Amino acid sequence: GKALVYEFAKRGAKIAMGARNLDELQKIETDLKSRGIDALSVQTDVTRELDCKNLVEKTVERFGKIDVLVNNAGISMRALFEDLELDVIRRLMDVNFWGTVYCTKFALPYILKTKGSLVGIISVAGFLGLPGRTGYSASKFAVRGFLNTLRVENLKKGLHVLVAAPGFTASNIRK
């Protein structure tokens, strides 16, 4: 997420960021502003529908529009399904899938107005099940199906949908 923020900033974008850790967000916001980048940070738990709505509302309030939404919040897991507590899968779906659904639901009308882009960061695990990643793979398959369906539903409206599936990366997903 942080790397994406800096890449968009480097290209002149105004940045709205949402995450649970407000202190980290504010550090990034301060750094961006010191570089002349207009930035907004909003504490957001993507498992909470109202947090996602608030993030979108504050973004539109501040910038007047949304050109790109990057759904990047995610958590992972490692355990064989037979050893797994079902709450782990529920939590994975809440963050990885429902977080994408909630943020997209509230941002989509604004993205359609700008004929902008809707992005979902999934994983190679969203194409091929990985051992010990049952819940994680399921959540990423769900995001891929959701976004691909939105692409088809909005073909004639100018919506660009990108589903990015990187391999293993250096990130905070396990933290």
Where are the regions a protein language model picked out?
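Conserved glycine-rich Rossmann-like NAD(P)H-binding loop of the short-chain dehydrogenase/reductase
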Residues: 11-27
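Canonical Rossmann dinucleotide-binding motif of NAD(H)/NADP(H)-dependent dehydrogenases/reductases
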Residues: 1-14
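Active-site helix of classical SDR
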Residues: 104, 139
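SDR active-site lid
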Residues: 156-175
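Residue(s) in the substrate-gating loop at a strand-loop-helix junction
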Residues: 123
